[in-house]
């Protein structure tokens, strides 16, 4: 091209008369280079090349519309040349002049929405010509800017969505197998070392111990005792939250940390959470504000987690190197999320990781052929990632642990603060960074997702029991305008929004059904050795979801596999499943999920916790009422056995609740013909029937004894309130005491009387 451009401030015009069939790749390069040389101050080469590329594409469409093949070909060459020069800008910043010095930063800003966006086809053309060895240098500014966006405490779901969108665009445009590999080369995608990064130079351990000892000595403690306690306090100071480095220094951890909506914690007092719940406390002032705030926050959390899950899925699908690094990082998070003082990530991080694992499992859930790829054995627990995610001390379903009767001594107190667990954690973490054995991807996803569900959703669902009515009790004491009451309302919104996403609930239900089918495929020996939480989660998660959101059960699919699992595990009495907690969860699942509402009655605990009314699933009710003779033959004796064995299953304080549930099951099954026939054959199992009869008599005796103890208290309160005459001096004293009592004391006496009457 000769002469000056028509408009130096605009992109050159390409017409048929100017081209005349002589425009080739070389001349196109000269044209584009001339435009870059005449770039104004502040203009960036990457943006200029993108404008040229877009204009050439528009001109190519115009030429195609008028069937000008020569012009269309020439313009295509010019556009491709612009994309090729863009790759030069990214590989060698400054190679095309001053305007190309910040091209990598411009690319990162454009992907994050801080600058004019770049078309995917332009990015694909530019990044395709960058070698895999240099692609990681091009990706580094992008990852750095993503981390800077998320590190402030004010980061929101909008920032997460923007970062995930930028990284997903990179994965789509930078090429299969190489895009993810370039990202994970960055230190923000690596598993950090076990030791916590310190903010400054720490004092030597001995000097710090001496500081503690000196303070205790000043308080009057003996020298040797002060030294011992100083060492112990130093151990407490070293016991840091091992999940925090993954949340504060790693990009995936930063994303997951913000994904939970409002920030709440389980291990700190509610008063200390005011900062994280401040926004919700301003929004939610009364119970009627909770539904709308919950819907809004749930939608935000859902969009945020879907974006993170999409990013993790993109990393896993991009290539083997990216997939292995991502799985190892997520496994390290599981390793550091197990309950205990050494490793406990925040609820938002654990729930976000759980949603990501469920997203990875989504393609095979419900597909019988694909689910069969999850090997029906416990061999994966012996692999490197399996050992890192699953502690060696997990309780098995065939184990019935007995509480220790040994008295606590000083050594046991010291064990609470030593750092012996660091060695175990470090060894497991090292395993999580080694290449895994050759297990099918479905097998790996199933086992690791099962652990993520236990540490994430299952752990958090437990905290939702009775949470709806805690603010009402607080308001009765301090009023609705008190910060504590408003913080409780905000916590209700935060917890339900973090757990109540429709997509996550659907994935959880599908995954629980998959767990049931996998457990049914296990041999008896493997089922006995199976970690207890796998069986418990398959039973409790649908129940807890029904408790938190009663509509969940009504709109869910029937659960024939769960019914078969209950019949198999309970039908063998205690020979297959000895764990008392697992047996109690199996019976509770039958009561919560398979009984009609008319057959249920609230237990003592449910009445005390103001539990929402349970719903029913018509499909499940039909499954139980018309069960096969094989299931009925196993289930009926097992339920009688559970009733009589209630003292030995579950929590000792829940014996009455367990028997109420089992009694409702027995009553309902007796009305079904197939189960009544099974009950009539119970005489063949003398041991189960005797256990049931003993349990029935024991429970009756216990209730009668409790009623006899409470009758005098009920009579005394009736005398206090004037329902009965005060016929002697003792009764007159009780009435005078009640009449002279203040309102608080009267409420206490009335409440105790209501509890006694409720017991009767």
Question: What label would you give each PLM region?
Answer:
Residues 2-760:
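Extended alpha-helical scaffold domains
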């Amino acid at each position: 091209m000769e002469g000056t451009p028509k408009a130096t401030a605009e992109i050159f015009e390409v017409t048929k008369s100017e081209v005349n069939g002589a425009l080739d790749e070389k001349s196109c390069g000269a044209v584009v280079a001339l435009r870059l040389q005449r770039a104004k101050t502040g203009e960036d080469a990457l943006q200029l090349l993108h404008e040229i590329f877009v204009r050439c594409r528009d001109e190519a469409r115009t030429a195609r519309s008028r069937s000008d093949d020569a012009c269309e070909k020439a313009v295509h060459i010019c556009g491709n040349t612009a994309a090729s020069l863009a790759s030069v800008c990214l590989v060698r910043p400054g190679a095309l002049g001053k305007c190309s010095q910040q091209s990598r930063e411009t690319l990162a800003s454009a992907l994050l929405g801080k600058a004019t966006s770049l078309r995917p086809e332009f990015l694909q053309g530019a990044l395709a010509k960058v070698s895999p060895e240099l692609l990681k240098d091009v990706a580094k500014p992008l990852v750095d800017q993503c981390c800077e966006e998320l590190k402030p405490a004010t980061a929101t779901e909008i920032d997460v969505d923007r970062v995930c969108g930028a990284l997903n665009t990179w994965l789509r445009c930078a090429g299969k197998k190489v895009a993810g590999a370039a990202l994970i080369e960055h230190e923000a995608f690596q598993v950090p070392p076990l030791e916590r990064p310190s903010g400054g130079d720490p004092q030597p351990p001995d000097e710090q111990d001496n500081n503690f000892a000196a303070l205790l000595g000043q308080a009057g403690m003996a020298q040797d005792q002060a030294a011992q306690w100083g060492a112990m306090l130093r151990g407490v100071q070293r016991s840091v939250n091992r999940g925090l480095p993954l949340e504060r220094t790693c990009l995936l951890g930063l994303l997951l940390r913000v994904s939970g909506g409002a920030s709440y914690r389980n291990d700190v007092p509610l008063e200390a959470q005011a900062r994280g719940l401040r926004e919700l406390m301003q929004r939610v002032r009364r119970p009627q504000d909770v539904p709308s705030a919950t819907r809004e926050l749930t939608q935000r959390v859902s969009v945020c987690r879907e974006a993170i899950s999409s990013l993790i899925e993109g990393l896993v699908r991009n290539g083997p190197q990216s997939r292995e690094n991502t799985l190892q990082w997520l496994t390290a998070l599981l390793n550091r999320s197990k309950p205990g003082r050494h490793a406990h990530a925040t609820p938002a991080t654990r729930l976000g990781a759980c949603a990501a694992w469920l997203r990875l499992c989504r393609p095979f859930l419900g597909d019988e052929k694909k689910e069969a790829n999850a090997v029906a054995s416990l061999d994966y627990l012996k692999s490197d990632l399996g050992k890192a995610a699953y502690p060696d001390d997990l309780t098995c379903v065939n184990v019935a642990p007995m509480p220790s009767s040994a008295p606590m001594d000083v050594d046991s107190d010291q064990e609470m603060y030593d750092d012996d667990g660091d060695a175990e954690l470090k060894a497991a973490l090292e395993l999580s960074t080694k290449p895994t054995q050759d297990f099918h991807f479905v097998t790996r996803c199933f086992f690791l997702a099962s652990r993520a569900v236990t540490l994430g959703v299952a752990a958090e669902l437990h905290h939702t029991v009775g949470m709806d009515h805690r603010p009402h009790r607080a308001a009765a004491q301090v009023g609705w305008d008190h910060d504590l009451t408003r913080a409780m309302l905000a916590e209700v919104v935060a917890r339900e929004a973090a757990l109540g996403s429709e997509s996550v609930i659907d994935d959880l239900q599908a995954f629980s059904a998959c767990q049931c089918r996998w457990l049914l495929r296990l041999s008896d020996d493997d089922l006995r050795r199976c970690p207890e939480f796998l069986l418990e989660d398959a039973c409790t998660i649908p129940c807890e979801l029904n408790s938190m959101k009663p509509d969940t059960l009504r709109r869910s699919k029937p659960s024939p596999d769960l019914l078969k699992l209950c019949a198999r595990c309970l039908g063998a009495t205690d020979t297959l499943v000895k764990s008392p907690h697992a047996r109690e969860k199996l019976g509770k699942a039958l009561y919560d999920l398979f009984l009609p509402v008319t057959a249920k009655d609230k237990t003592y605990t449910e009445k005390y916790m103001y539990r929402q009314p349970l719903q029913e699933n018509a499909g499940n009710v039909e499954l139980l009422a018309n069960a096969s003779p094989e299931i009925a033959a196993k289930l009926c004796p097992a339920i009688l056995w559970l009733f009589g064995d209630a003292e030995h299953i579950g929590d000792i304080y829940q014996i009455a609740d367990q028997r109420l549930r089992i009694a409702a099951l027995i009553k309902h099954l007796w009305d079904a013909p197939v189960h009544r026939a099974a009950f009539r054959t119970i005489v063949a199992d003398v041991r189960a029937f005797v256990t049931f009869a003993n349990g029935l008599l024991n429970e009756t005796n216990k209730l009668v004894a409790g009623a006899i103890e409470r009758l005098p208290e009920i009579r005394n309160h009736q005398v206090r309130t004037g329902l009965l005459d005060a016929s002697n001096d003792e009764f007159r004293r009780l009435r005078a005491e009640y009449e002279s009592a203040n309102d608080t004391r009267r409420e206490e006496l009335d409440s105790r009387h209501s509890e006694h009457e409720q017991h009767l």
